[in-house]
Amino acid sequence: MNNMSKKQEIIGLIDADLLDNGTRHPNLVLLKLAGFFQDNGIPFELILDPQANTLHYTRIYLSCVFTFTKLPELYIRSKGTPEEKKFKCGGTGFYANEVSVMEYRRKREQDMNQLEHDEFLNTLRNFHGGKEYGISMSRQMPYYHLYDQFINQQVKKGFKREKFKDYQKYSIGFLTRGCVRHCPFCVNKLENCILPYSKLQWFLDDEKDKNGKLVRPYIYLWDDNFLASDPSIWRPLLKQLIETKRPFQFRQGLDERMLAESPYGEEMAEMLSRSRYHGDFIFAFDNWKDHDIIEKSLKIWKRYNPKKGTKFYLFCGFKQSPTCLLYTSPSP
């Protein structure tokens, strides 16, 4: 727990998804905000009571990832009162269902940049480079202990600590951001390119326990479409991941189609086969019309990875009518 001797100066952090339905993973934006406040010696806490009194918080940063999440009572209660001004809200949960392309573009751009333009944050020192004041979201080291109190509460309720390993055992970040697929159901639907984002060392945690073992021995990567980036991007980054000798996983899945579409597809499969991959390899299969290229890619993949577990995120029904026969090859 952070230094909270001056309660009137505490900054509150809210993971709206956690307070509503619960969530398997920590909120990376909040981890980075917590790291920024930790760097500056500013007291903060993760608010775990959806009906908490907000009076002793000077500012509250609320993040919501999913559109189905119900915002917490403490925020709803603040509407139309002076307390509402304390809240800074963001996340895809506030705009992902926006149907107007222009409005979606405006909201996403505003959301992606708002913390780096935050007046209060820009009064605080930046200790990770890029600029002298204000948070750099790509460079900021996450504070990986933000959810410790939540985990301890759940353990007291009878849950096993291992249930919350995604909060405890992983360094988390994006090596790249962006995509080129323009899938209409994805938050990256308006993106046109994939660019480097964070360097691995900016979020790779080296904390060790009393026995000298890494507290967070695994790496979670949340890149949108890593393999579709330019070879000058993905190749050195994948090499760097392999050289850490730490198990890693691309949590949002990898684009299987690139193995067949890219002239470097076999190199991708070979490099991944040499990695200490964490768990099964997960690929995206979002559109049934891609089944031919997926099958071609799988043949390449299995040539280099004949025994490794391979799974797909399968998006059922996209651009399919109710009468369409899925999983059936089209007539010649």
Per-region residue spans from a language model:
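A short, structured N-terminal alpha-helical element that caps or precedes a catalytic domain
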Residues: M1-C89, G93-E98, E109-D111
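Canonical Radical SAM [4Fe-4S] cluster-binding loop centered on the CxxxCxxC motif
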Residues: T23-L31, K165-D209
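Catalytic core of nucleotide-activated saccharide and alditol-phosphate transferases
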Residues: P82-C179, P184-V187
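Conserved small/polar residues in nucleotide/adenosyl-binding loops
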Residues: Y327-P332
